[in-house]
Amino acid sequence: MRVGMGYDVHKLVKDRKLIMGGVEIPYELGLLGHSDADVLLHAIMDALLGAAALGDIGKHFPDTDDRYKGISSIKLLEEVGKKIDEANYIIENIDATIIAQKPKMRPYIDDMRKNIADALKIDVDRVNVKATTEEGLGFTGSGEGISSQAICSLNSVSNYIYGAADMTNCRSDCGGCMGCQNK
């Protein structure tokens, strides 16, 4: 089993959409960044890449590359999911926290979880997202920005018992792991 941790933060500014977990959230401010600045997905991607010892999102999607300017972080998460598959890991779980004073995230969390699970081709019950405030303290508490933290666990395909696995939803040519039975 491998564990990864990710963290991201972006500044809130006018004239930008607020995208969190692939969901557009109605708000007068949005996050400033090279891509759509989805801090939740950026933290999750860094956690996944870290757990697999594949670097970080800056290595794979540098902000100096115009191909990623304004790109949806859901597309980047899909690419990270492919890299995790290619490295022969299975995502066991993801647990993430959004830290924002405003707006309230609770109404959008189920959609965020679904978007993350769909992008990674995993069951939604392997993804948890929660939100908290900093009680008015710090840059998130004062409304200057939003941050996110994520942790994930991966398991190597070779750690699963091979045998008569249900290959119906298999995403790789690994030879059949029991992990696919849960899809």
Swiss-Prot record:
Keywords: Isoprene biosynthesis, Lyase, Metal-binding. 4-CDP-2-C-methyl-D-erythritol 2-phosphate binds at residues 8-10, 34-35, 56-58, 61-65, 132-135, 139. InterPro entries: MECDP_synthase, MECDP_synthase_CS, MECDP_synthase_sf. Its cofactor is a divalent metal cation. GO terms for molecular function: 2-C-methyl-D-erythritol 2,4-cyclodiphosphate synthase activity; metal ion binding. Binds 1 divalent metal cation per subunit. Pathway: Isoprenoid biosynthesis; isopentenyl diphosphate biosynthesis via DXP pathway; isopentenyl diphosphate from 1-deoxy-D-xylulose 5-phosphate: step 4/6. It catalyses: 4-CDP-2-C-methyl-D-erythritol 2-phosphate = 2-C-methyl-D-erythritol 2,4-cyclic diphosphate + CMP. GO terms for biological process: isopentenyl diphosphate biosynthetic process, methylerythritol 4-phosphate pathway; terpenoid biosynthetic process. A divalent metal cation binds at D8, H10, H42. The record marks H34, T133 as: Transition state stabilizer. The keyword Transport does not apply. Involved in the biosynthesis of isopentenyl diphosphate (IPP) and dimethylallyl diphosphate (DMAPP), two major building blocks of isoprenoid compounds. Catalyzes the conversion of 4-diphosphocytidyl-2-C-methyl-D-erythritol 2-phosphate (CDP-ME2P) to 2-C-methyl-D-erythritol 2,4-cyclodiphosphate (ME-CPP) with a corresponding release of cytidine 5-monophosphate (CMP). Homotrimer. PANTHER family: 2-C-METHYL-D-ERYTHRITOL 2,4-CYCLODIPHOSPHATE SYNTHASE, CHLOROPLASTIC (PTHR43181:SF1). Belongs to the IspF family. This is 2-C-methyl-D-erythritol 2,4-cyclodiphosphate synthase. It comes from Lachnospira eligens (strain ATCC 27750 / DSM 3376 / VPI C15-48 / C15-B4).
